[in-house]
Amino acid sequence: MRILLAAAECAPMIKVGGMGDVVGSLPPSLIKLGHDVRVIIPGYGKLWSLLEVSNEPVFRANTMGTDFAVYKAKHPIHNYVIYLVGHPTFDSDQIYGGENEDWRFTFFASATAEFAWNYWKPQVLHCHDWHTGMIPVWMHQDPEISTVFTIHNLKYQGPWRWKLEKMTWCPWYMHGDHTMAAAMLYADRVNAVSPTYADEIKTHEYGESLEGLLNYISGKLRGILNGIDLDEWNPAKDPVLPAKFSIKNLENRLENKKILQREMGLEVNSKKYLLGMVSRLVDQKGVDLLLQVSRRLLAYTDSQIAVLGTGDRYLESGLWQLALDYPGRFSVFLTYDDSLSRLIYGGSDAFLMPSRFEPCGISQLLAMRYGSIPIVRRVGGLVDTVLPHDPENNIGTGFCFDRFEPIDFYTSLVRSWEAFRHKDSWELLQKRAMSQEFSWQRSALEYEVMYKDVCGIKEPSPDVAEVEKFSYGQSADPSLKKV
């Protein structure tokens, strides 16, 4: 099949959240299944120097009253085709925000539609979040192009209908109060990025006022869990890690822990319990819970906490104050640094994700891959990927709590601290976490089944049987399922 993915991000070149990981990593797995998969993204300023871009555009057109050109490039790691929509509105490296954000992405969606109609016509046009939400509306009456719409984060819903009508063409048949609603109505299939999130968004608590619509379209809604690139994220080969390690030589992790402690200004002591967090510092990620429990945790235990990220000013200020009050025990770097993030994954003992909501989450997968035990709230994709630690039966991969309350989070932290003191049991827990299988293999097979379904390909796919062989997060080493 010919499949075109349209999105605002594509890792590793241009990435803010999980969408970038999906758009960057899903195509290689689909290509291995025999499909012609390409990606189209806005031509942000830095991409022209990061990628080898064609000298001449492959397509020119006019939409929304302005000219644009599409250039051809190759993904720097996986070598599949990427198309860049060239226009002055994308010259900045800023992806989101700004006064013209609504116009920029509506224009990108319109340019993508023109490109798909007139240059490279896919059988499936796979759209991601509201930025491409008008594409399913425009493609609704085209029998040759089927559309799939992926919800990465329901909270961001795009411009309202009245604003869209001032910017672009809204077909006579279009319904929906805003871009996100219209996309879900008119896409041939809709998926969320985890099975649990697909169920949650049909409820009032997580539906962001769209739960009625989501229940209405539930027949075409499903959840497909994200994966990670196991070659890119491999602690045995990661060039950033000072000490490489695997399940067979976990003792090497201690060197990373000491270097992490030194780099973040913590007391260098491998026996201390080191908690890490790499996150946008926003309410969604539960940073306010961390602020509420940190002082009590540091008073009661000998724990250390290392935080990396940027976000809301008041949360940054709270974390900064904790670092001032607890030198050597609490450290925060208010930036994003890929090398330091990998060191946190590969050197911390446990990883914090006390999220209010979490459509899928990638960080917990990376943490487990690198032997850092996730401490998570049981919500969204965290339910599907982290199994509660049961020391009596030696099963589970992390520590979980249900209510978004400080006492629940604090209890999980203390339980994990106590478990860390039992070194043999903790090492088995690390090995179970590291052996979980979260590659893109299963996700790609599930997307393939959905693509064939939406295109009306009725013959049995051999890949359907393959899907049944895998369960989310199954152990890559059967001997470690119950150690």
Swiss-Prot record:
Record PANTHER family: ALPHA AMYLASE DOMAIN-CONTAINING PROTEIN, GRANULE-BOUND STARCH SYNTHASE 1, CHLOROPLASTIC/AMYLOPLASTIC
List of residues binding ADP-alpha-D-glucose: K15
Protein EC: 2.4.1.21
Protein name per its UniProtKB record: Glycogen synthase
Keyword Aminoacyl-tRNA synthetase appears in the UniProt entry: no
Its job: Synthesizes alpha-1,4-glucan chains using ADP-glucose.
Transferase listed as a keyword: yes
Pfam families tied to this protein: Glyco_transf_5, Glycos_transf_1
Keywords, in A-Z order: Glycogen biosynthesis, Glycosyltransferase, Transferase
Highest taxon, organism lineage: Bacteria
Biological process terms in GO annotation: glycogen biosynthetic process
Similarity annotation: Belongs to the glycosyltransferase 1 family. Bacterial/plant glycogen synthase subfamily.
Molecular function as annotated in GO: alpha-1,4-glucan glucosyltransferase (ADP-glucose donor) activity; alpha-1,4-glucan glucosyltransferase (UDP-glucose donor) activity
Disulfide bonds: none
UniProt pathway: Glycan biosynthesis; glycogen biosynthesis
CDD domains, A to Z: GT5_Glycogen_synthase_DULL1-like
Catalytic activity: [(1->4)-alpha-D-glucosyl](n) + ADP-alpha-D-glucose = [(1->4)-alpha-D-glucosyl](n+1) + ADP + H(+)
